[in-house]
Amino acid sequence: GKLNENENLEAVYEKCTPYKIEKYLKMDIPYKKIITTPESFPKIRKAARKLNINIYKEYFCLFDECEKLTQDVDYRRKISQPIYDFFQFEQKAFVSATPLEMSHPEFERQDFQLIRIVPDYDYKKDLELIVTNSYYKRLRIVLDNLKDSKHICIFFNVTDGIADLIGNLGVTDYKVFCSQQSVNKLKKRGLVNAYSQIDYPLAKYNFFTCRFYSALDIRIGRYKPDILMLTDLRIAQWTMIDPFTEAIQIQGRFRRKGNDDVTYNSLTHITTVNPNIHIRSNEEIRNRVEQFITNYNLLKGQQETDEFKKGAILEDMENMKYQDLIDERGEINPFSIDNLYNEERVRSYYQSADKLYQAFLGTGFFN
């Protein structure tokens, strides 16, 4: 979407070739702007080095939707790879409408400043929160009340759950927007209207996974959509939606048309809760992480000094419980540690209807 609106942009993603990046970097235009996924950033670095371009001096690095490094690093291990490059840029910024606290020591070491922009107008949005034990029954009631809606946009972060919903509801006028891997999975189940890129016009029922809608701009056509956010803890805990980040980002995907500030008709979150969810305290997480780091560094030291046991020690390191906290350089990844705290924070909201309600109020964004 962003690429189509600006001919001077270059989008670097999974299928983009190094030759294409080099060709763009050689273009004789006053300003160059490259948009990339974190996973594809090494392609830019490689192309720049080949052309003897010092991107760290000549380019400004803007890391958008920066909370995703914390939120997604547990299943997108490569999302934080460019952080070493990021800190080498002379001009740089981490930005988001919904940032999370970050513990990476380099921010303090490089004297980063926290700048908060507060609107001087009323930006709060109305949201209906429905907490239920009769999940599908309530969902059917809500959808029945929206039967005259031209476009219903449903955000549900589990592909199999989306497939089941489409089957159970018997809908035919639908589109699913998700990763290419999920597209292939859905098509094997006979759901042919699945896309890895936004496809217009929107259908009556439009399903989005969280991996897809991040940083996406959804154009509003003639009719405004109704938005449903779904969380079903019986299916998967990763269907939880964080009121402080994801809920705000979801409604913000729909861009204003002209001077119209209202971009959708309604915003609803249907969810189950689980009072039996065990929440680790910050102290418990801190103790576990500190013990892991101690054990990891001990094994790492032995690996460096004992050549004969190197293979066995490496295997022990890879089998450690918190191995996911280690980045591709073998260093402790601060974003992975932040992820542990963040997940417990979000999980705590789903212990009761009141806790979730208070969380939505606490954002200062929703009525």
Predicted regions and their residues:
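Conserved helicase ATPase core of P-loop NTP-dependent helicases/translocases
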Residues: 181-209
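Inter-Walker segment of RecA-like/P-loop motor cores
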Residues: 6-49, 188-195
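Conserved strand-helix element at the start of the C-terminal RecA-like helicase core
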Residues: 1-3, 34-38, 138-170
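Interdomain hinge/linker at the junction between the two RecA-like core domains of SF2 helicases
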Residues: 97-145
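SF2 helicase catalytic motif II
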Residues: 38-41, 49-93
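Conserved SF2 helicase motif VI
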Residues: 234-263
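A short beta-strand element within the Helicase C-terminal
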Residues: 217-232
